[in-house]
Amino acid sequence: MKGLNAKPFSHEAVRQKLLSGRESLQRRYHQNRNGAALLRDHSRLVDGILRQVWHEMNMPGSTALLAVGGYGRRQLFPYSDIDLVVLLPDKGDAAEAMDNELGTRLEHWVGLLWDIGLDIGHSVRTVKECGEEAANDITVQTSLLEARLLGGNSDLFDRFLQVMETMLAPRKFFVDKQLEQQQRHKRYQDAPYKLEPNIKESPGGLRDLQNVLWISRAAGFGKTWSELAKKGFIIRREARLIQRQQTVLQDLRIRLHYLGGRREDRLLFDYQNPLAEELGIAAKPPRRPGEMLMQRYYRAARSVTQVNTILLLTLHAEIFPDEEAVTTIINERFQKRGDLLEICEEDIFERDPGAILESVLLLQQNPDLKGRSFATLRAMWRSAPLITASFRREPRHCAMFMEILRQPRGLTRELRLMNRYGILGRYIPAFGRIIGQMQHDLFHVYTVDEHILMVVRNLRRFMAPEFAYEYPLCSRLINEFERPELLYLAGLFHDIAKGRQGDHSLLGKVDARRFCERHRMPAEDTELVVWLVENHLHMSATAQKKDIADAEVIADFAASMRDERHLIALYLLTVSDIRGTSPKVWNAWKGKLLEDLFHRTRQYLCGETALTDISLENRKNKVLQLLHPDDAAMRAYERFWSGLDSSYLMMHDPREIAWHTQHLSQRMKSPAPIVKTRAAETGAGVEVLVYTADQKDLFARICSFFDGIDYNIVQAKIHTTREGYALDSFLVLDPFNVANHDPREFQFIEQELTQQLEQQALMATPVKGRLSRHLRHFPITPQVSIEPDDSGAYYVLSITAGDQSGLLSRIAQVLVRFGLNVHSARINTLGERAEDTFLVTGSILSNSRSVIQLEANLIKVLHTSPQPETPGKAPGKPSAGDRIIPR
């Protein structure tokens, strides 16, 4: 008898058999790209080895070895776990049923399998315990549903199947699996999973397809797509479509395993470009191969989501028939069944495709309708190809679409549904081209179509009274705005040309104009929509890169606005756009900048051409209203102000001036540095005031300090008094961007920064921070631009680069080396993209050769990845790939 004392068989030979078998499968897969065959053949290879080892171990005839889970259904991916159950006869429990010799033998068996190279996940259970575990855990029950016999007692396996079949309750199984799916979707909906989705678990992943088949099998409708087609749940064309998308996802998952050399189901940034190259996907500038691969994935996932939703609704209707639902006729095309909208006849959309848009309107106009029946949704999905050029030209259809945009409720929900089922992309072909298109610009975390619909959703949210507390100004403005559907149209088209060669704003306005003209919109409305699409980045760029306290900046911006209606529309679109890129991009400081720009421009447009709130005398008066000084204090304030020129008063608002005056008017010639802090008015961030005898590297020292404590400088205002003192103010954000600050935080900054400025020790060279994986795989080409400003008094230094810790310190130290003085700084971070603007002066700026050297040094410190040395390239000179913007 074989067993522990039998002559051991050569596990090394078995290990080599497994290794060579897997290598052969990998070679064959890369030759024929047949994923289904690989999964099946890999399962077969492992089956043979497990049977051989089970036989050699001479396991008792009363036991059985089962394959379960994905391996059980013969879909074994290259590095997936091999899930097994050792089935024991019912003798109390598994521990009781397993005598000492069997326990030792199983322990030896598990160790042997690991030595051979099989990553197994195993459990030892009796038939009764399998039933109990399955009853308590839907995941266990689902895994055991896939069980098949590998070796051992077939009668025991039959008993196991009977128990599993007896306890399978289709209704409970459906409810549990649906809840499990909802929880999984919620878990994988976070932004990182959108950028790096899990092919198996994310919404639209392989698990969503398996879920449909598990429920179908539990209800007795079949366990394959062809069986579901035979039962009439889907048509054969749809079965082929599902199979095709399943193949796409399986292929990507197989390649991920091989590329990573391990079980890897996430499309990490590290793998996106290599996978694309392996699949022969070429770049189509400005889009990288990885972005095109991800569009292929997102479109497959979208199809899977469609199938999953429709089939689960269909199965629900079969498993939970609602025979008592009251039916009310709405018109000759639609009826209300219960609280769902239902088509009266199955082919209504084929006979009248316009009814697709009518169904959208009916859902919006009837609050008592909670959704569509499975038959309506399925017919809508199947009829999407009927939306053709002639459909789009039909005046009735154009009128209905515009009516959809005008509805006071349900717009966001219906636009998202129209996108999910292919309606929106067919009605607006330009929108169809950006579905599933990723944007690796380091601040968008959504695909272009998701971002666009998020922008529309943000605009709609401003309309809702229950959310008015979030953005009171935006809520008031949009509720007073005539024809808000024009804003929604601008939102739909603002990024619609992303991914094409050329300026997406200019290309998008062409699409927008074509749409408006096809829908016979008035010229005035068309002009506004087209103008918004063309200028949708203008307000954000002005607020974040220019000094909006400068009257000339406001005047120039106001001139580009045309009128107050254009300004209001652009403000609402800009706030919605920035908020729709990523939860991390929007913050209170950006909101305050945009709001200040809006108010100042609005005043200018309304005839206050002197910009009363910005004028010097008016500012002084407002400061005095805040301070209420007596005569002695007034004299001190006047002395303090006499040491400041008009640029200081223009640069700071009255509250800032009052704060500075309070702390500095009695200490104008302080021998020691003065550092004061307070919570920012925006609710996030800390305002820091620094007053000290001026020194050439002061800005760099302050940057170095905040870099050392992981605070981000988002704004700097630099001023030198007539007495030679630096009066600098900063807005900084802590690493966690909290709104409620501990007083000890303020005390720490004041004490530590004062000490650092007093010591004037040599600054350490900033160490390049660790890059995020996103930035490492999708680096931003640094851009540097140095141009004189309109006044001729300063130069504007604009920098774009990938953000990382220490970046501002490195920039500041370069400026010190070249003898430049920083007068103001706008530090704008969009996700992981830094767009910084500095107002500088220095003698070298009039020398073109020196400026080129400055640009080259800045490019060098801005690079986010190690720069390989190029033969023949002189040190300090930018390479051809670097962008120095010509003057």
Curated annotation (Swiss-Prot):
Residue segments, region Disordered: 864-887
Lineage, uppermost ranks: Bacteria, Pseudomonadati, Pseudomonadota, Betaproteobacteria, Nitrosomonadales
GO MF annotation terms: [protein-PII] uridylyltransferase activity; phosphoric diester hydrolase activity
Designated name of the protein: Bifunctional uridylyltransferase/uridylyl-removing enzyme
Record's keyword terms, sorted: Hydrolase, Magnesium, Multifunctional enzyme, Nucleotidyltransferase, Repeat, Transferase
Entry-linked InterPro entries: ACT-like_dom_sf, ACT_dom, HD/PDEase_dom, HD_domain, NT_sf, PII_UdlTrfase/GS_AdlTrfase, UTase/UR
Domain ACT residues, every copy: 687-772, 796-871
Regulation: Uridylyltransferase (UTase) activity is inhibited by glutamine, while glutamine activates uridylyl-removing (UR) activity.
The keyword Transferase appears for this protein: yes
Native source organism of the sequence: Nitrosospira multiformis (strain ATCC 25196 / NCIMB 11849 / C 71)
CDD domains, A to Z: ACT_ACR-UUR-like_2 (cd04899), ACT_UUR-like_1 (cd04900), HDc (cd00077), NT_GlnE_GlnD_like (cd05401)
Cofactor(s) needed: Mg(2+)
Record's keyword annotation contains Cell inner membrane: no
Annotated EC: 2.7.7.59, 3.1.4.-
Domain topic, free-text comment: Has four distinct domains: an N-terminal nucleotidyltransferase (NT) domain responsible for UTase activity, a central HD domain that encodes UR activity, and two C-terminal ACT domains that seem to have a role in glutamine sensing.
